[in-house]
């Protein structure tokens, strides 16, 4: 089981990958659904990984805002007190999350040396 679970919309997989690389360079183990095939057991595997993780980073953008999967993962993470919201693009958060403090990485270029990180 990983230290950190990253929730994201599949079209923003590159952002999840870049963040996972930085976290791993800093000694964390990271899990996100790269390579996981949808189908039987998909939802159970996602839930298992969220429950096992110490923290869940949710990458918010317009696409993830409208994703039932991302919203459900975020709700579970929040209920488990593991939720870390991160903006990667300008978007309004879903109503359930608008009061949460959110880390702003909208200007981050993916570099581990970026001042925006």
Language-model segments: which ranges?
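Glycine-rich, Arg-bearing micro-motifs that act as flexible, cationic patches
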Residues: 66
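Short low-complexity, flexible loop/linker segments enriched in glycine and/or proline
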Residues: 45-48, 73-74, 100-101
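Conserved beta-strand scaffold positions in the cores of enzyme catalytic domains, especially
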Residues: 83-85, 102-104
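Conserved N-terminal substructure of TIR/SEFIR domains
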Residues: 1-58, 63, 78-82, 89-91
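Glycine-rich, charge-decorated loop segments at or immediately adjacent to ligand/cofactor-binding or catalytic sites
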Residues: 91-102
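C-terminal helix of von Willebrand factor
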Residues: 108-117
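Short amphipathic alpha-helical segments
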Residues: 17-20, 69-72, 97-99
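A short, gly/pro- and small-residue-rich
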Residues: 69-84
